[in-house]
């Protein structure tokens, strides 16, 4: 594969992870995630030993969503984990993990920083996604953009400062809170995201030496 192809594949993974943190899975999205093309994508991603267990768990849940009730239960898991903002949830905002204040504000420093990154790239958070710019879905989508449009050094700098600096804390919180739910979909998704980011960081570092 050429560097262009590799970076395009990296961008696809970041965009996929971003989309799964951005909103609940509805029936239309489920069809996309379980299509023949998607199954091939999951299988290819799962060949890597560091991703295989998480990918298998994700595929098992997706392929088992055969009723409206099952979809609603997964949507309730998403809401309970990422939308309600209690001690039993895992809020997906960088500011809540990077700021030392006891009650950090949303739309604070990390939001402003991400907004500036987006502005510099002539991008913006879509109007139908009314969230602060330091939401994990926005950050992962932007990393996918950088994969195709920026040099390795800029990608690595952003990854270190805006993702790797807090992702492990977020993932630990997801795993802790999601253990109360039956299928563990979001635990697997979070674990896969962390493993992907760590592997991508390592490959960027190697490419620069």
Curated annotation (Swiss-Prot):
InterPro entries xref list: Chaperone_TorD, DMSO/NO3_reduct_chaperone, HscB_C_sf, TorD-like_sf, TorD/DmsD_chaperones
One CC-aspect GO term: cytoplasm
Main location, first listed in the record: cytoplasm
Protein's GO biological process: protein complex oligomerization; protein folding
Transmembrane segments: none
Keywords assigned by UniProt, alphabetized: Chaperone, Cytoplasm
Localization, UniProt: Cytoplasm
Pfam family, one: Nitrate_red_del
Function description: Involved in the biogenesis of TorA. Acts on TorA before the insertion of the molybdenum cofactor and, as a result, probably favors a conformation of the apoenzyme that is competent for acquiring the cofactor.
PANTHER family assigned to the protein according to its UniProt record, in alphabetical order: CHAPERONE PROTEIN TORD, CHAPERONE PROTEIN YCDY
NCBIfam families: PRK04976.1
Record-stated family: Belongs to the TorD/DmsD family. TorD subfamily.
This protein's name: Chaperone protein TorD
Organism: Shewanella sp. (strain ANA-3)
Gene name for this UniProt entry: torD
């Amino acid at each position: 594969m050429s560097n262009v192809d590799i970076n395009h594949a990296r961008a696809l993974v970041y965009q996929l992870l971003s989309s799964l943190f951005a909103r609940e899975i509805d029936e239309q999205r489920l069809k996309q995630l379980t299509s023949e093309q998607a199954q091939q994508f999951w299988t290819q991603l799962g060949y890597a030993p560091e991703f295989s267990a998480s990918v298998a768990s994700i595929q098992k849940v997706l392929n088992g969503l055969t009723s409206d009730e099952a979809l609603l239960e997964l949507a309730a898991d998403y809401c309970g984990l990422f939308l309600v903002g209690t001690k039993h949830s895992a809020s997906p905002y960088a500011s809540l993990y990077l700021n030392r204040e006891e009650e950090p504000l949303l739309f604070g420093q990390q939001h402003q920083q991400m907004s500036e990154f987006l502005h510099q790239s002539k991008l913006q958070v879509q109007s139908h996604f009314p969230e602060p710019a330091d939401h994990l879905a926005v950050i992962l989508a932007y990393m996918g953009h950088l994969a195709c449009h920026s040099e390795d050094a800029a990608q690595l700098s952003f990854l270190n400062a805006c993702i790797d600096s807090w992702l492990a804390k977020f993932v630990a919180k997801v795993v802790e809170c999601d253990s109360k739910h039956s299928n563990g979909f979001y635990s697997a998704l979070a674990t896969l995201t962390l493993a992907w980011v760590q592997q991508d960081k390592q490959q960027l570092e190697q490419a620069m030496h």
